[in-house]
């Protein structure tokens, strides 16, 4: 996770890579009928062509502020699924795998929809033991008619980037059973958003050590919970019995429109079958948080300002990242404005591709940010390991980042520090933008700023020239990042920083062969890396970047709703998994370190007034707010 708190202007992060332009890409390229590459692969529905409505909808005006949600806890229960199925390809994989491995000791009911052995049919292997004739999703072996849980589907619950794996406990792969009301999963609610549930089946043919990264996607559902407790209808004594019944029915209908409350059957998207999921909301009249509300688990990052720890909130059991910042240090470094900007931005934004702020609080010595713990690793880590990404994977990440930057621009925020270290991957392979310490707030489209900040290899020419810059600086950095993902290095990289600055200002943009950077990508990069910010693609808004033919096959509505299954999933075993973090940090004992030095004066403390954040309020003020992402405006279901 990108918690390197001191990374600012003078850092360089990527040494030259050997054989950068000859290494094979990370996944195979899928082409459509016209020979063009499609943006994602791996168990997804086909990607429909984009249209102007999709682009315009995602760059619509800012929606009115959403109503503030009461602080509380969302309680989720999983009950059962029915009618799950594999795609024809994976049906064949399953059947052939288990037949080839000759699981002849198994006894399985022939009916895929029943747990009973009554009426079963079986064939006999040479061992003389009965063997099932069923195949496909139910092809796995059983013991006395029961499936091992490793052959049953599991669910991934995702609420505000808090992600939890839930295994089915019994039933069949086709009709699994979960624990129902016996096991509830609690999520802290800090803003109105949806619950995403994705279903997977373990891949019996996965490579050794692949973990969950090659598991088979079965489908997904989106739940729109009701973030208030149910209000029962009370009979009106002035009405007749019949009229009261009508009024009660109307009341119940209105209640349903406020969101799901209770258990309901929901059909799977991008899959077959349905699943029964229960949700409820409990208001939590909690006082301000303090450090004692969390168990400290591991250190996952450090810097001169403080450190980041993996923590567990005691009342819900959810895992978070707790970022601690020493007040005295940021005061001495004149970093108070940057630190407050990070908190302010995180409190405002509700976007699927940005790490959400859950809470913030303070002590006399420190500031604390409680963020979603996104533990699939930095994009930097994966790019270093693979050297470069194939065109589909690079396009997918670029599209999600484009939506994240568009969202920030909609809130008059320039990001200014886009780089692989500041991009995290979640369990499912979607990106999450983090580290907002260099953001510039309150920037209208025509506004210019002159602050010299960023990371050397990503600095735009206008920033180096010192003539002021606008939001278009973010489109330059997006181009640099796309170039790096495709080739392994930023376009003007040099180990000598001054030479790199000269190249950024003067060197012509060059590309490797077209099998690495295809013509559509080359054209997009040429226009994003235009040294004239007024000519640069994106100068008139994100819509003109989305309209570029490099993104021709992306449906932006689906992308914003995270309906595309990423082609790569990190190997993450659970919410507490820290294997994608540097052992230099995780081996350290987690503790809230004592702060030496004089007590801060009241004047110094006043700089941090309004820091604490427990629930959003409507609006964009510094007190926080959960305002709907402008990218979601006017998108019809």
From Swiss-Prot:
Biological process according to GO: negative regulation of TORC2 signaling; positive regulation of induction of conjugation with cellular fusion; positive regulation of transcription by RNA polymerase II
Phosphotyrosine found at: 613
Phenotype when the gene is knocked out: Leads to abnormal hyphae growth and impairs the production of conidiophores and asexual reproductive associated structures. Resusts in thermosensitivity. Leads to an increase in ergosterol content and a significant decrease in glycosphingolipid (GSL) levels, especially the metabolic intermediates belonging to the neutral GSL branch including dihydroceramide (DHC), ceramide (Cer), and glucosylceramide (GlcCer).
Secretion signal span: none
Active site: 417 (proton acceptor)
Residues that, per the record, bind ATP: 300-308, 323
Enzyme Commission code: 2.7.11.1
Pfam annotation, one family: Pkinase_C
Modified residues (Phosphoserine): 593, 612
GO MF annotations in UniProt: ATP binding; protein serine kinase activity; protein serine/threonine kinase activity
Top-level class of the enzyme under EC nomenclature: transferase
Family, similarity comment: Belongs to the protein kinase superfamily. Ser/Thr protein kinase family.
PANTHER family linked: RIBOSOMAL PROTEIN S6 KINASE
Protein known as: Serine/threonine protein kinase ypkA
